Amino acid sequence: MVQRLTYRRRLSYNTASNKTRLSRTPGNRIVYLYTKKVGKAPKSACGVCPGRLRGVRAVRPKVLMRLSKTKKHVSRAYGGSMCAKCVRDRIKRAFLIEEQKIVVKVLKAQAQSQKAK
């Protein structure tokens, strides 16, 4: 005959926090084991990239709190909050803006020297 199963905790509804799986004990009984919720890795701070960040553990917030810093970020500028592609683009953009400022300054200086002559 099939063995009947009962929940081991007080919550008797099939909610997200009450998910279970079957497990066979050494005494050949089948019992419920409660499964933990799956974690998600953080998304990029840029808000453009659709995927999750690589190099960061995908765990629940309570577990994340206990992890060491090396498991929560990657050793790069904006590591753990922004993906590598976005960081690369941001650095390039900042460089080009600085170059543009220098070009404007040089052109202004040339115009001043032309006026002086």
Swiss-Prot record:
Protein keywords: Acetylation, Cytoplasm, Endoplasmic reticulum, Isopeptide bond, Phosphoprotein, Ribonucleoprotein, Ribosomal protein, Ubl conjugation
GO BP annotations listed: cytoplasmic translation; translation
Cross-linked residues, Glycyl lysine isopeptide (Lys-Gly) (interchain with G-Cter in SUMO2): K108
GO cellular component, one term: nucleolus
UniProt signal peptide: none
Residue numbers of Phosphoserine PTMs: S12
Subunit structure: Component of the large ribosomal subunit.
GO molecular function, one term: structural constituent of ribosome
Record's function text: Component of the large ribosomal subunit. The ribosome is a large ribonucleoprotein complex responsible for the synthesis of proteins in the cell.
Residues with the N6-acetyllysine modification: K36, K43
Family statement: Belongs to the eukaryotic ribosomal protein eL34 family.
Gene3D superfamilies: 6.20.340.10, 6.20.370.70
Claim: Kinase is one of the keywords in the record: no
Pfam families: Ribosomal_L34e
Coiled coil: none
Protein localization: Cytoplasm, Cytosol; Cytoplasm; Endoplasmic reticulum
Protein name: Large ribosomal subunit protein eL34
Organism placement in taxonomy: Eukaryota, Metazoa, Chordata, Craniata, Vertebrata
